[in-house]
From Swiss-Prot:
Primary site of residence: other
Molecular function terms, GO-annotated: cytoskeletal motor activity; structural molecule activity
Pfam families attached to this UniProt entry: FliE
Organism field: Burkholderia lata (strain ATCC 17760 / DSM 23089 / LMG 22485 / NCIMB 9086 / R18194 / 383)
InterPro entries assigned: FliE
GO CC aspect terms: bacterial-type flagellum basal body
Protein name, entry field: Flagellar hook-basal body complex protein FliE
């Protein structure tokens, strides 16, 4: 169970880092070194890709756990399956909300008069 807590802690730290970067603060040495717009864009793109890959990986892991439980694997308990499914669901919902915020911000910028 401590592995799950440390995993949640690392996700929380990533979210706080991304929030600090979005608000203009410097959360990591990489962000401090990214002085040009292109470097910042690639950092943002790589962070988004890493987040989406993690969400996808969590979903695949949860699906694998569920299938293993269905076929009766002795080392997979119902508790593990339920926790993994909920973690995948929370990650997906978080990704969905980030997408909604990005689309909303894009629409706001596009409607600004020049």
């Amino acid at each position: 169970m401590t592995a799950n807590v440390s995993g949640i802690g690392s996700v929380l730290q990533q979210m706080q880092s991304m929030a600090a970067q979005a608000s203009g603060g410097v959360a990591s040495p990489t962000a401090a070194l990214a002085g040009s717009g292109a470097a910042t864009a690639s950092t943002f793109a790589s962070a988004m890709k890493a987040s989406l890959d993690k969400i996808s990986g969590d979903q695949q892991h949860a699906l694998g756990e569920a299938q293993a439980f269905e076929v009766g694997a002795p080392n997979v308990s119902l508790n593990d399956v339920m926790v993994d499914m909920q973690k995948a669901n929370i990650g997906f919902q978080f990704g969905l909300q980030v997408r909604n915020k990005l689309v909303s911000a894009y629409n706001d910028i596009m409607q600004m008069s020049v």
